[in-house]
Amino acid sequence: MQNKELIAQCEQKAQQWLAPAFDEDTRKAVENMLNSDNKDALIESFYKDLEFGTGGLRGIMGAGTNRMNIYTVGMATQGFANYLKMCFKNMQQISVVVCHDCRNNSRLFAETVANIFSANGIKVYLFDDLRPTPECSFAIRHFKAQGGVNITASHNPREYNGYKAYWDDGAQVLAPHDKGIINQVNQVKIEDVQFKGNKNLIEIIGEDVDKAYLNMVKTVCIDPDVIKRQHNLCIVYTPLHGAGRVIIPRSLQEWGFTNVHCVKEQMVKDGNFPTVDRPNPEIAEALTLGLRDAKALDADILMASDPDADRVGMACKDSNGEWILINGNQTCLIFLWYIITNRQALGKMTPKDYIVKTIVTTEVIAQIAKKQHIEMRDCYTGFKWIAHEIALTEGQKNYIGGGEESYGFLAEDFVRDKDAVSACSLLAEICAYAKDKGKTLYDLLMDIYLEYGFSEEHTVNVERPGKSGADEIQQMMRNFRTTPPTNLGGSTVCLWKDYEALEATDATGTKTKITMPESSNVLQWFCTDGTKVSVRPSGTEPKIKFYIEVKDKMQTASDFKACRARAYEKIEAIKKSLNL
């Protein structure tokens, strides 16, 4: 039995969407919901307002206050415009960049955003078609704009779309601007939105920005000579119907690779993602067609970018010639190992160089940094925090690479969001480097494990939906704080970190301060054998995440499978000790 009071509230909100201010299709969709005997669609669409969070908007497309549509996008943009005008009131001409991916309605939403900004007297640089997220970030810096909006829902299912807000450094908004924008958006009513655009303030951009961006991406190349020797490296690439199709094959060609094969069916721009269940390069199902082509061509590497081309997944052959997926931690490890090793070999390292990883990403990276005497910085999850580290050291230090376990990587500082364009090009260079030495990417990974220690990472998502679920997650975190674990699957905990208190406690009870830009509801436990467990509630979904990392030693590459089997056993023991 549906809650009568809730239905009445939703009906009242829905009635407002029958006003002439709303377009005919929207009014018709709302009428159908109101007239239907089943009120599920009405409740889902109107029981709350789609929340503009610290990352912007993300939701299912459709009519209603809890859906992505031109009206919810419009109110978000009006609020963002109001905030920009507050912050830059002394500026003669505020400007923004507007970009979008391949999703259904992405162009419509991008044009809506452009119209509203221009109606507010803000100059808009609007891309002529879909472009990668990193190019949006680049363009904000290129045009010295004060902000930007990217219409994308990354690798979410086809029903979703989203709205990412950027600041003048090309990074996603951080404090205090995130809260400032949210505050302004929450004050906007639909009648406040200025939908009628000013065409004189909208400039269509495209090829010139592509050229400028790709010229800068070429500077990421570390060893052009190895590419010349291995230009015929067999590369298979798929954009999964998304924005990578515009730029990534071109970037690979400009770097000097002459044997690039794109998965034909997935080079078609299509927001329905007809060839995959979910357009997520992390999962094997999304790479089915890519693996088909890679096997047929006996390729050296398969790379896939997600719909907005900011993350890259890859596959290569193992020691038995079987195709395997390389996960996000391993990819980040290979990237940073290669950058450090080869910058050193070519005499390109400076004392000012540093790398960044998120706190939940593999600690093998810390081992490499320590052994190679290079500064490594830890930051919170979310690429805006890596961008924050770059901003902190601008003009004083030299950022040479950073990444996270969730398949995001950035090898340059002229972009301030994760970049699958430069990542794919650099991955191809790393593969060429391996082939030049008679090795594969898999062999390189084994070499890293042999020198710095084996590591296996596993993420556990515990879902707890609804209000009771949110309360349960809060209680779990409270319990972990009041009674922190001392043993994890047989491993003795020797260091406890609480990022809400910004405090670390060692085995003797000695407390030290953790230096971070702000507090965050995250806990970490480190064990004497190198085991690490990180716990944090998701900021966007009703779940709590456990990131487990376990260590082992490899004597030879043939030990890998045995190490992995032991790691899986260890991970299960840790899960059991945490009642997961």
Where in this protein do the model-derived segments appear?
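N-terminal small/polar loop signature for handling phosphorylated ligands or for N-terminal nucleophile
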Residues: V97-Y160, T258-G313
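Conserved phosphate/anionic-ligand binding catalytic regions in large, soluble enzymes, centered on
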Residues: F46-N66, A153-N156, I235, P239-S251, ...
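Short Gly/Thr/Asp-enriched flexible loops that form oxyanion-binding sites at enzyme active sites
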Residues: F109-F117, Y160-W167, D310-Q330, I365
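Phosphate-binding and adjacent anionic-ligand microenvironments
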Residues: K295, A299-I301, E322-I324, N342-R536, ...
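An N-terminal, well-structured beta->alpha segment
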Residues: I7-V113, E203-N232, A243
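Gly/Ser/Thr-enriched, mixed-charge loops and adjacent short helices
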Residues: W17, A21, D25, A41-S45, ...
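Glycine-rich phosphate-binding loop plus the immediately following alpha-helix
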Residues: Y166-Q194, N329-D353, K357-A366, A420
